[in-house]
Amino acid sequence: MHSARQKLLSTLAHKSFRLGEFKLSSGGTSDYYIDCRTTTLDAKGSRLTGEVFFEEIRQRGWKAQAIGGLTMGADPIVVAVAVVSGELDGFLVRKAEKQHGTGQRIEGFREKGARVVIVDDVCTTGASTVQAIEAAREFGFEVVGVMCLIEREDAKGRPNVEKAAGAAPFVSIFTANEVRKEHMLQNDDTEPSIFAAAAACEVCGRLAVTNNPRPRCEAHKV
């Protein structure tokens, strides 16, 4: 029987990973894109996300009281973990304080001094994760752990997150490379145009997504 972790990886590779040419929020470009929300907002994917995150938190012995992150990438993860755990409360961090009503930036769980875990879906530059860490500490939470569903190692966001996290460990459930490999395995037999070999596009040198009739990337395929 496949573990929840393996099932989650398989779901991410199938539902959330795409090859092509994409512009990133950092301003750079990439030959792949990951939209975690197609998995974390999926009925089965949400349950798997909650199970995997909660098990990791439990195994690490962080003794957290709540879990939260910057809206909106973290939102479905926070809800999934809260529901699956039955014991961790959730909070959401607004990108800016409300300009009306209570004017608060932290929504949901608001117990100062509480031990909390910060979560995010994809860590690229780490900017959204860092914002959430800073907002949580400014409010009065004790950040005991930081987690992301997928870490894009090529973007080198880990040092930024680790600097902001301080003594709190930063844990990624999967790397983008792991998801990419699983995606290639899933499509190896059913989509011959997508192959796992590290072939380069003969036009621009990017990773090829087809070898029929020539090795080409998404932008230059015939």
What is the role of each PLM region?
Residues F53-A64, I133, R137-F139:
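Phosphate/pyrophosphate-binding loops at sites that engage ATP/ADP/AMP, CoA/4′-phosphopantetheine
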Residues N211-V222:
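Cysteine-rich micro-motifs
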Residues M1-R60:
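Active-site-facing substrate-recognition patch
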Residues V78-V117, T124-V130:
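Short, glycine/charge-rich flexible loops or terminal/linker lids adjacent to PRPP-binding catalytic cores
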Residues H2-T11, E134-A197:
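PRPP-dependent phosphoribosyltransferase catalytic core
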Residues F195-A200, P213:
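Short metal-coordination and nucleic-acid-contact micro-motifs, chiefly zinc-binding Cys/His arrays
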Residues W62-G73, M147-L149:
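Short glycine-rich phosphate-binding loop at a beta-alpha junction
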Residues C201-C204, C217:
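Short cysteine-rich clusters marking metal-coordination/redox-active sites
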